[in-house]
Structures are given as C-alpha cells and as structure tokens.
Amino acid sequence: MKRYQVGIIGGTGMVGQRFVALLENHPWFQLTAIAASARSAGKSYWEAVCDRWALDIPCPEAAKSLTVLDAEADAVKLAGMVDFCFCAVDMPKDAIRALEETYAKLECPIVSNNSAHRWTEDVPMVVPEINAEHLAVIEAQRKRLGTKRGFIAVKSNCSLQSYVPALHPLMKYGLERALVCTYQAISGAGKTFQRWPEMVDNCIPYIGGEEEKSEQEPLKLWGRVENGRIVKAEGPAITAQCFRVACQDGHMAAVFMKFKDGCKPSIEQIKADWAAFRGPAQELQLPSAPKQFLHYFEEPDRPQTRLDRMLERGMAVSLGRLREDTQYDYKFVGLSHNTLRGAAGGAVLLAELLCANGYIQQV
C-alpha cells in the first residue's frame, strides 16, 4: 500500500523524538516533515536534537537530514506536504488550541498528544480499545470548523493508561468508585536523570494538574456521544494522588475499587475479563496494537517497571497483585509505558484507527 505522508509538530521534545523513532519503518506511515519552534527552524533535525536526544535508541538516519520547519510560520507549507500531523508541542494551552485549529482549518488532520483540546466537546479523546465510537463526533467538529478533511483528535493523559484499561471491562459489574495512586516516571515531565539530577534518589508527591486529569479524564472516555458532542459519564467516582518517582520510563498505579452492593465479581471473574478483553485495535489488527492488551502476572512482586514496561513493544498494560481489600472490594497494581502506550505510541495507534475507519484519507 502507498504509505501516508506524516508530519510531526513539536518533533524535538521527548515525545516528538518518540514519534520519530516509532515512524521509522512503520508499515502505513512515512515521516515527511518535522516542525518545531522558531529557534530550531532551518536546522537539520539532528542538528536541532543532537545535544538532547533523550531515547536509549539511535535517532533514525532518515530523520536526521530533514530540515525543521517553523510550526507556526510554516503551517501552510507543512499542511500541504502531508496527509496528517501528530502534535506534541510545548506551548501555553491557549496557543496550542489555536495552533491545532489552524492546521485543522488548513485541511490537515491533527492527532494530538497535548491536553489543550481534551475537554473540547466535539474533539474525541480516544483510547482505541475503550471508546472508538467517540470518533463519530468528528463530523460535527468538521461542521464547526468549516472543513472537509481537517479535524483534531486527542489521546488521554499518560497516567490513565495504567488503570483505566483495567477498570473498563469491569464497568459491567457496577463499578462505583476507585482510589488511585500513581507513581510516574520522569520522562513524563520530558526529562532524563542527566537533565533533572534532583530526581535521583527522590520522590516528589506533586505533579501539577495531574490529579485532576487522572480523576476527570476517565469520565470523558466513558461518556456518550449526543447531538454532536461528548457528554461525560457521571461515574464511577475516582480520587487520585500522583507522585513523580525516580524511574526513567513507566507509570505505575496502585488501584482500589468498590462495586455497587450485590454486584461484586469474583477474583476469578476479574482475571478472566482481563484476559479476554479486546477492542477495535485488536480486531482490526492495527500495526501498533498489542495482541494481548491486558497481561496479568501471578507473581507477588510483579509487574515491575524495569522488567515489564516494554511488554508488547511498550503497548500493553501489565497488571498484578489483585486481592481483596479491607476498605474497598479489591486492590491491584497496574503498569504502562508512559511515552509509548501513554504518549507517542498511543497517538500512533489512534492514527491507525482513524485511517482504518476512513477518517484520514490520503491527499
């Protein structure tokens, strides 16, 4: 098949670098253009990132020679070069909202890793295995924007991936509330230990805005499409605390869950539901989809960040330590790779879903 021509807006940051790495040899997508801030514009990609390449794998050779465009000044040029763009810029939210809408109105679909449009009512925020039906609001968004091809779709916050996928197949039992404590790697802040030495041998009990996202964004994922907008779900109620911990990659969550009276499933039922859980990403056999989305470990000391974050190329969710609790019904531990499943990898999977469903077509 002819590959889609793809651009990355915000390609020099850590998530942008992940996009560059993931698009190397992708069967559907070919990286054609990279845009960033004015200070990087005009440089070769490698010249722009050589002193801050943050990944533990080499920069793809094909990307090194690409000339970096100015994400704002070169918007018309970039939009004309590609079939769609990924967006992972570091800008104020109002500026991101305006930039993404500029590209959409230039008929360039945007698949965004940013949070700026997550609460825009006609912008789908999608985990492909959980709420692919929300893509239906794209037509209403196109009417609002006055576009034929252009639209914005976003992925959810990286913290959600370690617990929402595990809770989702249990919603049928009347999940009433959950308490979540997340332990989030420093790459979630776009940092390495070399650039953030204060995090060595440290844990910080605060990540700005993260607890609100962790409590509220699941309700949009579990919401419904109504009159061209997404109406968030009323429950389950989630309370969260979020910690920054001394790991390079991998977000872990300790999760406590309570079901409605008389609806509590057995441990065996929960494990069976996790093992059987599949979504459109698996059914469509999308290139980036894990074959088994949720993996349960019976060992009492798993999942572990170092051992399990790269399960199924970093796109699966690892679960363990499911047991009864004295205050809630059950508790368990979840783990996901925050810059793969939780960021660039999740966005690539979303783009694959959009292409497979005809929302993104080649120019």
Regions flagged by a language model, labelled:
Residues 1-205, 237, 322, 348-363:
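N-terminal Rossmann-like NAD(P) cofactor-binding subdomain of oxidoreductases
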Residues 5, 14, 28-79, 179-182, ...:
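C-terminal substrate-binding/catalytic lobe of Rossmann-fold NAD(P)-dependent oxidoreductases
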Residues 91, 259-261, 338:
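Non-catalytic surface loops within mature trypsin-like serine protease
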Residues 95, 162, 266, 342-343:
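Secondary-structure boundary/capping motif
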Residues 311-363:
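NAD(P)-dependent Rossmann-like dehydrogenase/reductase catalytic/cofactor-binding core
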